[in-house]
């Protein structure tokens, strides 16, 4: 079950049209995990021998039966696609068996999705012991106008690429299972490295503006039954 605040959706859409009037056609990007797909159960069920590092070849072949489409995002994707805009997907998963993910998305979204055509794989780079996003490189190459994602790294990548970032609200059950990369890590409360807690998160939500100044897409998706 979900709620969409149509007035906010229309306002956001109109702002984007006026901001990017070139030909009336936008290049719109979407993250996959916790943005298009509620894929928590896939990652929780990764076999122990495929967890360190994560075997994305296994992950990409197991969305069917485990991942759930986040319906408000699907409706948003359909809005852009049906109005003639270019819809593209960029994930931090690696591309091994990426064709399986493309097939799964094609069946669920009802339009053709192909690896390296409108679905791109952009794994993080490990530098000095920390993972860093590489999505901005693909965003820049694709000349994206907008990018929708749930993670802090998605917002940072969009800003680096010159695209307008829009935060998708992460489901609470995903936050409880995996706190990092979402407004820092609110599960730890306020710390030097993570200055926000759940109270702060609700403040961001109510203002529809995130920690980097990004728009927050006003949806609440209750998650799996």
PLM regions: where:
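Flexible, charged surface loops at secondary-structure boundaries
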Residues: 20-24, 81-82, 139-143, 159
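A periodicity- and composition-biased signal for non-globular, repetitive helical segments
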Residues: 12-13, 141
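Hydrophobic h-region of N-terminal signal peptides that target proteins for export
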Residues: 13-21
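Alpha-helical substrate-recognition element adjacent to the catalytic core
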Residues: 26-126
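Bacterial N-terminal signal peptides that target proteins for export
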Residues: 2-9
């Amino acid at each position: 079950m979900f709620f969409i605040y149509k007035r906010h959706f229309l306002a956001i859409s109109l702002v984007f049209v006026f901001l990017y009037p070139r030909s009336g056609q936008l290049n719109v990007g979407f993250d996959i995990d916790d943005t298009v797909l509620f894929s928590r159960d896939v990652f929780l069920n990764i076999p122990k021998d495929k967890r360190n590092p994560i075997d994305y070849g296994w992950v990409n072949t197991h969305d069917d039966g485990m991942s759930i489409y986040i319906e408000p995002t699907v409706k948003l994707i359909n809005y852009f696609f049906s109005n003639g805009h270019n819809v593209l997907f960029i994930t931090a998963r690696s591309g091994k068996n990426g064709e399986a993910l493309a097939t799964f998305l094609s069946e669920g979204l009802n339009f053709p999705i192909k690896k390296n055509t409108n679905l791109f794989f952009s794994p993080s780079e490990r530098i000095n012991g920390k993972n860093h996003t590489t999505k901005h490189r693909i965003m820049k190459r694709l000349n994206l106008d907008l990018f929708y994602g749930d993670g802090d790294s998605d917002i940072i990548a969009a800003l680096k690429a010159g695209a307008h970032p829009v935060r998708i609200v992460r489901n609470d059950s995903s936050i409880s299972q995996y706190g990092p990369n979402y407004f820092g890590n609110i599960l730890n409360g306020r710390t030097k490295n993570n200055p926000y807690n759940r109270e702060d998160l609700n403040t961001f939500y109510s203002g529809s503006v995130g920690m980097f100044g990004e728009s927050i897409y006003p949806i609440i998706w209750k998650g799996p039954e």
